[in-house]
């Protein structure tokens, strides 16, 4: 049996929300995956708050007026494709990179700010 993408898409278009929900659940069970969006990591606990941080999460808080330039820098930093980088920039605030060394985090922040973005290190 040949896989016909157009037929699958047509069937999905005609399905109800309940049927689509059941489909997602079945796919999750069959392939051992989840359709849930990734969740940001919670802040460090109070014990770590006093210690000097040696790794940071780089968060894009705003793309500013020069979105195209920011998307290019995000692609360069993360290795994401154009669509994924655009979605990340459009979805600001969003984590660009997690758990990077202090020097690398500062470098990434400088590149993004130079492109016109607002960035915070967490």
Swiss-Prot record:
Key words, A-Z: Ribonucleoprotein, Ribosomal protein
Gene3D superfamilies: 3.30.1390.10, Single helix bin (1.20.5.710)
Keyword Endoplasmic reticulum: no
Signal peptide start-end: none
Key word Ribonucleoprotein present: yes
UniProt-recorded Gene Ontology molecular function terms: mRNA binding; structural constituent of ribosome
Pfam family name, one: Ribosomal_L12
Superkingdom as given in the UniProt entry: Bacteria
One Gene Ontology biological process: translation
SUPFAM superfamilies linked to this entry: ClpS-like (SSF54736), Ribosomal protein L7/12, oligomerisation (N-terminal) domain (SSF48300)
InterPro entries the UniProt entry points to: Ribosomal_bL12 (IPR000206), Ribosomal_bL12_C (IPR013823), Ribosomal_bL12_C/ClpS-like (IPR014719), Ribosomal_bL12_oligo (IPR008932), Ribosomal_bL12_oligo_N_sf (IPR036235)
GO cellular component: cytosolic large ribosomal subunit
Function: Forms part of the ribosomal stalk which helps the ribosome interact with GTP-bound translation factors. Is thus essential for accurate translation.
Recorded family membership: Belongs to the bacterial ribosomal protein bL12 family.
Summary of subunit composition and partner proteins: Homodimer. Part of the ribosomal stalk of the 50S ribosomal subunit. Forms a multimeric L10(L12)X complex, where L10 forms an elongated spine to which 2 to 4 L12 dimers bind in a sequential fashion. Binds GTP-bound translation factors.
Protein name as catalogued: Large ribosomal subunit protein bL12
Organism: Streptococcus pneumoniae serotype 4 (strain ATCC BAA-334 / TIGR4)
